[in-house]
Swiss-Prot record:
GO terms for molecular function: ATP binding; metal ion binding; UFM1 activating enzyme activity. The active site is at C243 (glycyl thioester intermediate). SUPFAM superfamilies: Activating enzymes of the ubiquitin-like proteins. InterPro entries: D-isomer_DH_CS1, ThiF/MoeB/HesA, ThiF_NAD_FAD-bd, Ubiquitin-activating_enz. CDD domains: ThiF_MoeB_HesA_family (cd00757). It comes from the Eukaryota. Pfam families: ThiF. This is Ubiquitin-like modifier-activating enzyme 5. ATP binds at G76, D97, K120, N143, N177. Residues 362-384 are annotated as: Disordered.
Length: 397
């Protein structure tokens, strides 16, 4: 028979499980918040996000609630991307995936073993609603590369904005195959929607993101990979018992780069990277800009290039530099400012040289040693000088 302490422990355990079930069934562990607040209290999930506004990074952070983002592919990168956007308080999130959660996915982030067998979009939506019930999450469990599903995908991003009937603000591609990337590329070119393409290499030690503005920058078909250019069926490249490697670290970094640039684009701060790569072996982050291909195979890309060329160009106004005037007319203490690279003025000359890094200077420089021969004048005396001549020299001294 169980003791009183054991019964109490069982009751506490059951009560804890009941609270979790209630929170899950309600869609979240807290009540919805109508308006974001910058009040610094432990119960405010937006205080640290609103601090970006107070620090002058973002002019109006709450605008993120008026943004709608579509995430295509809820795998290693896509699930973390959706998680980050949900925690940032995005207004609307539309998820696309047709796969199921497997135990083989547990080496990556976000999903848990008890979700194995569930569709990725439903499992993700359940967790994301628990994290932030303020975000409106829509799920689409189908393969966008089929003819029937492509039309549904096209309509979903065309009418999935915050206001009914308006397009989404941004499409994020987090898929793991070229066929799906080409489908997203075609849809966004047709609708003239800006989107981000992302990916991680098969050896899991490199990745990238690419911001595609139809007509302005290169689309995915402008410089396609060999598999796409040669119309090779990706399924024929797969081998039984062989799979691509994956690291949660690389996928987390790529997802972070993707969401960071998404926030910069949606909230208009910083500079959005056209292309940002990542090499984990040497911690290298290459950046570049890609121009559209005038002979691109995608006819919608050609149309968007024509539209972009027909737009009136923005006139650049050259800023006239203002003349710098001294803040104070008088310099009572004789203070002088020198440039950081002015090593001649910042370090005393003592006759000795020290190799130090740029921007550093020595706190103490030892005085140069002086030789007695330099301060006193001596007269050379040769051995063949006579005694009379030597006496004459001594008298003249």
């Amino acid at each position: 028979m169980a003791t009183m302490e054991e019964l109490k422990l069982q009751i506490e355990t059951l009560q804890s499980e009941l609270c979790k079930l209630k929170a899950t069934s309600a869609g979240g562990a807290r009540e919805k918040i109508e308006k974001m607040s910058s009040e610094v209290v432990d119960s405010n999930p937006y205080s640290r996000l609103m601090a970006l506004q107070r620090m002058g990074i973002v002019s109006e952070y709450e605008r993120i609630r008026q943004k709608s983002v579509a995430v295509v592919g809820v795998g290693g990168v896509g699930s973390v991307t959706a998680d980050m956007l949900t925690r940032c308080g995005i207004g609307k999130l539309i998820l696309f995936d047709y796969d199921k959660v497997e135990l083989a996915n547990m080496n990556r982030l976000f999903f848990t073993p008890d979700q194995a067998g569930l569709s990725k979009v439903e499992a993700a939506a359940k967790t994301l609603n628990f994290i932030n019930p303020d975000v409106k999450i829509l799920t689409n469990n189908y393969n966008i590369t089929t003819v029937e599903s492509f039309d549904k995908f096209l309509n979903a991003i065309k009418t999935g904005g915050i206001e009914e009937g308006t397009p989404v603000d941004l499409v994020l591609s987090c898929v793991d195959n070229f066929e799906a990337r080409m489908a997203i590329n075609t849809a966004c070119n047709e609708l003239s929607l800006n989107w981000f393409e992302s990916g991680v290499s098969e050896n899991a030690v490199s990745g990238h993101i690419q911001f595609i503005r139809p007509g302005d920058t290169a689309c995915f078909a402008c410089a396609p990979p060999l598999v796409v250019a040669e119309n090779i069926d990706e399924k024929t490249l797969k081998r039984e018992g062989v799979c691509a490697a994956s690291l949660p670290t690389t996928m987390g970094i790529v997802a972070g780069m993707l969401v960071q640039n998404t926030l910069k684009y949606l909230l208009n701060f910083g500079t959005v990277s056209d292309y940002l790569g990542y090499n984990a072996l040497i911690d290298f982050f290459p950046k570049m800009s890609l121009k559209p291909n005038p002979t691109c195979d995608d006819r919608f890309c050609i149309d968007r290039q024509k539209d972009y060329a027909a737009r009136p160009k923005e006139e650049r106004v050259e800023e006239v530099p203002e003349e710098e005037t001294p803040l104070h007319e008088e310099n009572l203490y004789g203070i002088e400012l020198v440039a950081e690279d002015d090593t001649q003025g910042s370090q005393p000359s003592t006759g000795t040289t020290h190799s130090i890094s740029t921007g550093l200077k020595l706190a103490y420089e030892p005085p140069a040693s002086t030789k007695h021969s330099e301060t006193t004048s001596t007269t050379a005396v040769s051995d063949d000088v006579s005694l009379d001549e030597l006496m004459a020299q001594m008298k003249s001294m």
